[in-house]
A protein has these predicted regions:
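Conserved structural position within tetratricopeptide repeats
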Residues: 34, 526, 559-563, 593-597, ...
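Start-of-helix register in tetratricopeptide repeats
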Residues: 224, 499, 533-536, 569-570, ...
């Protein structure tokens, strides 16, 4: 059986389970297991079938069984788990994916004793080993670094490809969280491995562990774990309700003060990541070309740097005009606003810098930037450990993701020494000092340790992995999917409220994602989450409907807004537009007249009043409006056409 057939059969079984058609799912699973070499799974399936038959028999007899629903849920959950395991085992022999290649490759005898507990002890000793080796020789240090990274790789691959933890492995994983000697960067990599493992196969123990990891005192570990939880909840949204312990655990998490805020923020950041392709296109096609186009014209502009210090206040106001006239000012402001919003503005810059050997290893995409990484430490040693203030500031910046910091570091260090010096000396000593002062170590540290900064950086790392990795086609790309996290039953208590949904709907509106905006706004009306914002709400709903060309529905929304906030000019203008586009010219005319009272010289309003009058056959009055338009706006072709048409129809040649 080939990979495509296996996945098709599994998908069908999954759809049956989602539709609660357990009997058919069991029959299909039995057929699938005939191709599976694991007899334990067949035995488990036979036990499930027996339990299901007994449950049906008790129901036929009319027996009162208060635990029937719990038994049924367990049967469905167990059936799903058997289907998961059988799919993986069969794909191990059929798939060329790296995941299955690792699973089917026999583990060398020398590594067979390396349990998670053993690996933890090895990682805990790294800092001491590195300190001692630094006193001995470079060869010893290289040996320690190499051993550490080989240990991390082995830990990552074994965790990623482990489909289900045993109770002992779960206990060892808990030791990773409580260890005071384990480097936080190593723990972060382990958390990512657990997340990727769950993306391949559901495992309740791992999900519970990620929820525990969210409570870790280090913000990097905690936020990384929560991002993983949200990813997994999105993937397995239809299965979570089968596990009472998990549902209760999530309900209890809601009592942790920052949990709701963290989940809502990550939700918004994930949606923002989906805008990266648009931003990337805008950067490549608009912003960067505009900047390059204006370089030559700005290069010869005298900025007064040669003036005496006493005359520094004599700045030429024409400089600002030059920026604005070139359009460069608007582009730079737009870029700055995107960056402050948390958008990924560096994707286009770093997309071409992921070809270094470092990125050929899957685990390296998820390891936080560290100067103790072997490639980094070697490069720094070659430079004689010279402290580079500017480079340090760049690498410590919270605006770059971890993988981008590695790309930037390798790129700069690959340049000849002369070019490096030229690049890093572009800022004068005074400017570096100012930058250092503004980005003092303490300020930078606080910014980098903000939960929002950490989660955003990690999401950017994940986005790059799913979009740029050489193995990207082997992974499920969450960012391509519809992200409606508030529809996940396990998170409904956390996200289904006005203070969460209103910003989400506004985000969709701002990004011109009209269908999603309409969906969320309508849901808010259903749950009655307006609370004094009714007029604003109906205006925004109407606007989204209008942009989606649903004019009749938009009119209904605008009329509700008009009831709550009468005679609003913006609302009347859009009612007029929708009535006109819906060919109800009489109603459109009445609202255009209301807008005209407030803005009597608005040329667009005057033109559309004339157009509506013409459509209604009132050509003489329409012509008067077109003459008025011609008077206000000279050489107005629209006015001339209107006058000509009305004169022709009225036979006033």
């Amino acid at each position: 059986m080939n990979e495509k057939t296996i996945n098709e059969q599994y998908t069908y079984i999954r759809s049956l389970l989602e539709e609660k058609r357990l009997k058919e799912a069991l029959m299909q699973l039995e057929s699938l297991l005939w191709q599976c070499p694991d007899w334990d799974l067949r035995t488990r399936l036979e036990q499930l079938q027996t339990s299901y038959k007994y449950m049906l028999e008790y129901m036929r007899q009319g027996a009162n069984d208060p635990e029937r629903w719990n038994v049924y849920r367990k049967l469905v959950a167990d059936t799903w788990e058997i289907a998961d395991r059988s799919r993986l085992l069969m794909l191990d022999n059929a798939s060329s994916r790296y995941y299955h290649e690792v699973r089917r490759t026999p583990r060398p005898e020398s590594l067979s004793a390396y349990t998670l507990k053993k690996l933890l002890h090895m990682l805990e000793s790294f800092n001491d080993d590195l300190a001692v080796s630094g006193l001995l020789s470079d060869e010893k240090m290289d040996e320690v670094l190499k051993r550490h990274e080989e240990t991390l790789k082995y830990m990552f691959l074994q965790t990623w490809t482990n489909s289900a933890w045993t109770p002992e492995e779960e206990e060892d994983a808990q030791s990773m969280l409580t260890s005071e000697l384990l480097p936080v960067n190593d723990l972060c990599l382990f958390i990512s491995a657990v997340t990727l493992s769950l993306m391949e196969c559901f495992d309740l123990r791992k999900i519970m562990w990620l929820l525990d990891a969210y409570r870790h005192p280090d913000v990097n570990a905690g936020q990384r774990a929560l991002v993983g939880v949200i990813f997994i909840f999105h993937i397995y949204r239809n299965r979570l309700s089968l596990y009472n312990d998990l549902v209760k655990r999530v309900d209890l998490m809601d009592e942790i003060p920052p949990f709701k805020e963290d989940v809502a923020r990550i939700y918004r950041q994930m949606l923002l990541c989906q805008e990266t392709e648009k931003i990337d296109k805008k950067m490549r096609e608009e912003i960067i070309p505009e900047m390059l186009k204006n370089v030559s014209s700005m290069r010869n502009m005298r900025f007064g740097f040669e003036e005496n210090e006493d005359e520094n206040d004599d700045k030429n106001p024409d400089w600002a005009d030059a920026f604005e006239q070139s359009g460069l000012g608007d582009k730079l402001r737009e870029m700055n606003e995107l960056q402050l919003e948390g958008a990924d503005v560096y994707m286009s810059t770093f997309a071409a810098l992921k070809s270094y050997p470092f990125f050929r290893e899957v685990q390296n995409w998820f390891y936080p930037f560290s100067k103790q990484q072997s490639d980094v430490i070697k490069q720094l040693k070659q430079e004689g450990n010279e402290k580079n203030t500017l480079l340090d500031l760049i690498l410590q910046s919270g605006f770059f993701s971890n993988s981008d910091k590695y790309s930037l570091f390798f790129t700069i260090r690959q340049l000849p020494k002369a070019q490096q010096d030229m690049m890093l000396s572009q800022l004068g000593e005074q400017q570096v000092a100012e930058l250092s002062e503004k980005s003092s170590a303490e300020t930078m540290k606080k910014f980098n340790e903000r939960p929002g900064t950490v989660s955003n950086q990690y999401l950017h790392d994940l986005y790059r992995f799913f979009k740029l990795s050489v193995r990207r086609h082997e992974f499920r790309d969450i960012f391509k999917e519809k992200l409606d996290l508030h529809h996940i039953p396990a998170l409904s208590n956390v996200l289904y409220s006005e203070d969460i949904l209103f910003p989400i709907a506004d985000f969709y509106l701002k990004k011109e994602r009209w269908n999603e905006a309409i969906e969320v706004y309508e849901e808010m009306e259903t749950i009655g989450a307006l609370q004094g914002r009714g007029a604003e709400y109906y205006q925004k709903l109407g606007y989204a409907l209008q942009k989606n060309k649903k004019y009749a529905e938009a009119i209904d929304a605008y009329l509700k807004a008009d009831t709550l906030k009468p005679d609003n000019i913006w609302n009347n203008r859009h009612l007029a537009i929708c009535y006109r586009l819906n060919r109800n010219y009489q109603a459109a005319l009445s609202y255009y007249k209301k807008v005209e009272e407030a803005t009597p010289e608005d040329t667009n309003v005057i033109f559309h009043i004339g157009s509506c009058l013409a459509e209604l056959g009132q050509y003489e009055e329409a012509a008067n409006y077109f003459f008025k338009l011609d008077f206000i706006e000279s050489n107005c072709i629209k006015a001339w056409r209107g006058i000509g048409w009305c004169s022709f129809i009225s036979r006033k040649y």
